[in-house]
A protein has these predicted regions:
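Short, Φ-rich (hydrophobic/aromatic) sequence segments
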Residues: 41-43, 270, 342, 346
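His/Asp/Glu-rich mid-to-C-terminal helical/loop segments that flank catalytic regions of hydrolases
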Residues: 325-353
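Active-site/substrate-binding loop(s) of hydrolase catalytic cores
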Residues: 123-138, 144-303, 307-324
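Extended acidic/polar, glycine-enriched regions
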Residues: 83-131, 141-142
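Extreme N-terminal flexible tails
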Residues: 1-95, 99
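A short, polar/proline- and glycine-enriched secondary-structure boundary/capping micro-motif
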Residues: 63-69, 110-114, 160
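Intrinsically disordered, low-complexity acidic/polar segments
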Residues: 64, 110-111, 192, 244, ...
């Protein structure tokens, strides 16, 4: 193993190598300032051509289909070599001098730049992050009705950003009448670049920062901007917990039972368009209802903030599984197609407004 390098020295990297025994690498993910146990990891292996290695974590952080694998940290596939919830194996071909592995199919800055290049979108700046980076803001369209879209309130939640990309691509070819998209694709921008968990940061994360005195520049800027706009609809794209149960599904998190009829109407449209899209499947019956499970938490969130705006017809988070199931399996293509279906469903929904 002397000539093999295993590291996280790249944008989005997150791993600690504990030890190496023969062809087995023992690993641990880094929580950093996350206060609770969380699962994201991402690392690179260089110089392992022709070798077969086993990677073993200290906790059960390997998904159903093994690791997400990429040669360029942009195009991903599943390794399909899971040994157990702790470990997976990988056989490096002789032309694989550098391979990236991750908990899930990461949506990186490279993916975002490819989207900008292919669509010609020119982003604005929402604000400067705590670390001095320009946080991207996208505006598309010129209609009076504003649709506010966000993702990566929690830095590690990549599936939601793929879904958001699909929404953007669909909107560009079939815009919703009299609307404008206002998009913050990576709210925790520093966290995305640094490879942080982002969830449950100390003292609290970006999605718990919708208070009268926000501590993060991004949430403060979103609040200020949204209050100036005629926001009629808001979607916050997320990924749920690691796996099992509802975490293997696509679901809407409903905050208010008073809007049940509106959620049902949109959900029925989304279920139909997802079924026709060759994307991740969504079923209305899987929605997380108000005051159930972790949705009983009354801490202010992006959705509670947008719901408080007098102009806002409906606001919710859309959660998309990291892995899915064998019959509803995550891939970058299916995530993007899910996003296209969300846009089509919303276009149909707006016809009744």
């Amino acid at each position: 193993m002397d000539n093999i390098r295993i590291h996280s020295d790249f944008e989005g990297g997150n791993v600690k190598v504990l030890r190496v025994e023969d062809d087995t690498v023992f690993l641990q993910n880094e929580l950093r300032d996350t206060l609770t146990d969380w699962f994201f990891w991402s690392f690179c292996v260089e110089g392992a051509q022709g070798r077969t290695l086993t990677f073993t974590f200290d906790k059960k952080w390997v998904g159903y289909f093994g690791a997400a694998v990429s040669r360029d940290y942009e195009n991903w596939r599943w390794s399909e070599t899971r040994i157990s919830p702790y470990s997976f194996t990988y056989s490096f071909s002789y032309d694989e001098s550098k391979v990236y592995f991750a908990h899930d199919m990461v949506y990186s800055i490279k993916n975002f730049n490819t989207l900008l290049s292919e669509t010609g979108i020119k982003p604005d700046v929402l604000c400067l992050s705590r670390q001095g980076r320009e946080v991207p803001l996208i505006r598309i369209g010129d209609g009076e009705r504003k649709i506010f879209l966000t993702s990566r309130h929690h830095a590690c939640e990549s599936t939601g950003t793929y879904v958001l990309e699909g929404f953007i691509r669909e909107y560009l070819v079939s815009q919703i009448e009299n609307t404008e998209l206002i998009i913050v694709p990576m709210v925790d921008y520093d966290g995305v670049i640094c490879g942080d968990q982002g969830k449950n940061r100390a003292p609290y994360d970006h999605n718990r920062d919708y208070t009268d005195s926000p501590i993060y520049p991004e949430t403060s800027a979103i609040i200020s901007l949204a209050k100036k706009e005629n926001v009629v609809f808001a979607i916050d794209f997320h990924s749920p917990y690691h796996l099992k149960g509802i975490n293997d599904k696509v679901f809407v998190v409903r905050k208010y039972d008073s809007k049940r009829a509106l959620f049902d109407r949109f959900g029925a449209l989304l279920e139909r368009y997802c079924a026709d899209s060759d994307g991740m499947r969504y079923f209305l019956c899987d929605d997380m209802m108000p005051n159930t499970g972790w949705n009983a938490d009354e801490t202010p969130t992006s959705c509670s903030f947008f719901s408080s705006l007098s102009s806002c017809h409906l606001a919710f988070s859309l959660e998309t599984a990291y892995f899915g199931t064998e019959d509803n399996k995550v891939s970058t293509r299916r995530l993007i197609n899910e996003g296209r279906a969300v846009c089509r469903a919303l276009s149909e929904y707006f016809k009744s407004l």
